[in-house]
Curated annotation (Swiss-Prot):
UniProt main location, coarse: cytoplasm
GO MF entries: ATP binding; ATP-dependent protein folding chaperone; isomerase activity; unfolded protein binding
Subunit structure: Forms a cylinder of 14 subunits composed of two heptameric rings stacked back-to-back. Interacts with the co-chaperonin GroES.
Recorded GO CC terms: cytoplasm
Gene: groEL
Known function: Together with its co-chaperonin GroES, plays an essential role in assisting protein folding. The GroEL-GroES system forms a nano-cage that allows encapsulation of the non-native substrate proteins and provides a physical environment optimized to promote and accelerate protein folding.
Biological processes annotated in GO: protein refolding
E.C. numbers: 5.6.1.7
Binding site for ATP: 30-33, 51, 87-91, 415, 479-481, 495
Organism: Cellvibrio japonicus (strain Ueda107) (Pseudomonas fluorescens subsp. cellulosa)
Cited CDD domains: GroEL
Listed name of the protein: Chaperonin GroEL
Catalysis: reaction(s): ATP + H2O + a folded polypeptide = ADP + phosphate + an unfolded polypeptide
UniProt KW Chaperone keyword: yes
Length: 545
């Protein structure tokens, strides 16, 4: 086992803090409507230019192991915010940095780290409650468009496009983002279905850029049982191989020898193939397989209807224009099913919705209707260069996550205003002792930091603006894009409540852990032995060359 270097107490925390600040300073430059860009070097090709906090955070890795641990912990804050709400990564990072900096000062002054953490946790919990209480529902196209615009760094064309997409496929529908071929953004609405199962083996991946499986015009085999014996699959595989088309298998499971053979065939290019587990469980799985069959014009191979795999032919297979899979989801676009049959199927499910008494069943049935009837909206991002395309695509994806979050939990006034109001709401909060009160104070001061950073990035004086916003009430805030004070919701500056809530929780959770750190352990750098010197020419051996 390699030797370790251990640091204790203040010296450990100071090194960790240095790493936190390096990463957070790079990320927070992107915050707000006047946030700056960050340029990321790529191992090949042009550098990437981004204003997306989590993209910047993911690129940073520091040479000093102790500083790097601090940076990685803040990176975790950004990733957590991104995973849970899809946005708010920069806000979460700014909050975490503020809490850690203030918290470590208090620890150095002799306060009890555990009480500080309890105070911070208490303040964050109350602030989250306040944010949820002031949220207003986000139902109409206008507010959806405003949320999308803010999240896409004040690009209204993106906000409008997302609002239009949501209008067309409904809030339950599926919206995906692709790279377009023209200079302008385009919106395509395609009949399709998405379900929450990903590829069964990473060896099926054929698009390395986004680690996904993409097949055009594939056959789709639907099986209502586990496939473990490759002999059962051979007749279908041979038929598909002759046709030259890809094959997508949707089954209860594909395992053992069958999965191994499919992987080998795929790698060798004999048959392009991908397998995915069928969505749902039990009777719901059977119903969803039947939905996919109706959508793709195929037949579910099930012993219940007297069909077995060995007797399956190409007639039993469904087809679709495109099937894409990542590790979590599969999307079937433009299935070859008859419109009349799809309509009948939707009607059947609607009858079940009316008859069911269980809320859970109703919700699942509504999801199935959305998948059959809602279709898939595809936003095609247009740009002049590849560098701009990648940056713009990342912004569209961010904006899409933000609008989904807004529809889910409502919106609050943006521009850091909601957090300033939360500070006022927890003004009377008290802990069990003085150190807990200090923790509450740390969290309250940290909640001002997103507004201050937005203002600083816009080139104004943070203290003056923060003071003016604090004196106001309700939705009164500062529009950094125009330099005007006013009602943030009327000005269309909205943040999804879920994004603000997640940023607070992620920052509080990880910053609390960092404040209570007492020791850090890292590998010692290995002293590599110096290379042996070259052997000089050895006299008398010339004849050997």
């Amino acid at each position: 086992m390699a030797a370790k270097e251990v640091k204790f107490g203040d010296s450990a925390r100071q090194r960790m803090l240095a790493g936190v600040n390096i990463l957070a300073d790079a990320v927070k430059a992107t915050l707000g409507p006047k946030g700056r860009n960050v340029v990321l070097e790529k191992s090949f090709g042009a550098p990437t230019i981004t204003k997306d906090g989590v993209s910047v955070a993911k690129e940073i890795s520091l040479k000093d192991k102790f500083e790097n641990m601090g940076a990685q912990m803040v990176k975790e804050v950004a990733s957590k915010a991104s995973d849970d709400a899809g946005d708010g990564t920069t806000t979460a990072t700014v909050l975490a940095q503020a809490i850690v900096n203030e918290g470590l000062k208090s620890v150095a002054a002799g306060m009890n780290p555990m009480d500080l953490k309890r105070g911070i946790d208490k303040a964050i919990a109350e602030a989250v409650k306040h944010v949820q209480s002031i949220a207003v529902p986000c139902a109409d196209s206008k507010s959806i468009s405003q949320v999308g615009t803010i999240s896409a760094n004040s690009d209204s064309s993106i906000g409008n496009l997302i609002a239009e997409a949501m209008e067309k496929v409904g809030k339950e529908g599926v919206i995906t983002v692709e790279e377009g071929t023209s200079l302008d953004n385009e919106l395509d609405v395609v009949e399709g279905m998405q379900f929450d199962r990903g590829y069964l083996s990473p060896y099926f991946i054929n698009n390395q850029d986004n680690m996904s499986v993409e097949h055009d015009n594939p056959f789709i085999l639907l099986v209502d049982k586990k496939i473990s014996n490759i002999r059962e699959l051979l007749p279908v595989l041979e038929g598909v191989a002759k046709s030259g088309k890809p094959l997508v298998i949707v089954a209860e499971d594909v395992e053992g020898e069958a999965l191994a053979t499919l992987v080998v065939n795929n790698i060798r290019g004999i048959v392009k193939v991908a397998a995915v587990k069928a969505p749902g469980f039990g009777d719901r799985r059977k119903a969803m397989l039947q939905d996919i069959a109706v959508l793709t014009g195929g037949t579910v191979i099930s012993e219940e209807v007297g069909l077995d795999l060995e007797s399956a032919t190409l007639e039993h297979l469904g087809t679709a224009k495109r099937v894409t899979m990542n590790k979590d989801n599969t999307t079937i676009v433009d299935g070859a099913g008859k419109a009349e049959e799809i309509k009948t199927r939707v009607q059947q499910i609607r009858v079940q919705i009316e008859e069911t008494s269980s809320d859970y069943d109703r919700e699942k049935l509504q999801e199935r209707v959305a998948k059959l009837a809602g279709g898939v909206a595809v936003i095609k991002v247009g740009a002049a260069t590849e560098v701009e395309m990648k940056e713009k695509k990342a912004r569209v994806e961010d904006a899409l996550h933000a609008t989904r979050a807004a529809v889910e939990e409502g919106v609050v006034p943006g521009g850091g205003t909601a957090l300033i109001r939360a500070v006022a709401a927890i003004a009377d909060l008290k802990g069990d002792n003085e150190d807990q009160n200090a923790g509450i104070g740390i969290a309250r001061r940290a909640m001002e930091s997103p507004l201050r950073q937005i203002v600083a990035n816009a080139g104004e004086e943070p203290s003056v603006v923060a003071d003016s916003v604090k004196k106001g009430s309700g939705n009164f805030g500062y529009n950094a894009a125009t330099g005007v004070y006013g009602d943030m919701i009327e000005m269309g500056i909205l943040d999804p409540a879920k994004v603000t809530r997640t940023a607070l929780q992620a920052a509080g959770s990880i910053a609390g852990l960092m404040i209570t750190t007492e020791a850090m352990v890292a590998d010692l750098p290995e002293d590599k032995p110096a290379a042996a010197p070259d052997m000089g020419g050895m006299g008398g051996m010339g004849g050997m060359m």
